[in-house]
């Protein structure tokens, strides 16, 4: 059995906001309320999008008519999964139960091994064998 770090992405709709910072705060707060305290092992952050012109990354927040669409990233570690695909299904199931009606997309799955020394982990990409 292997251990995996799974990163999922979701689009979060926030109404009645004027600034990107407000939208980010509300989106993270709402997602956190749905996840906690049961799923305190899930990390929530704002995703990034690359500018199509210059390639510079910026926060995934888009506002129109005081309504924002915020790209959120959810990260969790899945232990003792049979494969990367199995870890994806576990993460989507665990997080998806709390975030009903919010579609989740897998961004990245990385295998890691528990180290014998405390706090250290060795990471291996999904594509490495």
Swiss-Prot record:
This is UPF0212 protein Mbar_A2902. It comes from Methanosarcina barkeri (strain Fusaro / DSM 804). Coiled coil: none annotated. PANTHER family: UPF0212 PROTEIN MJ0068, UPF0212 PROTEIN TK1194. HAMAP family: UPF0212. Belongs to the UPF0212 family. It holds the Pfam family DUF555.
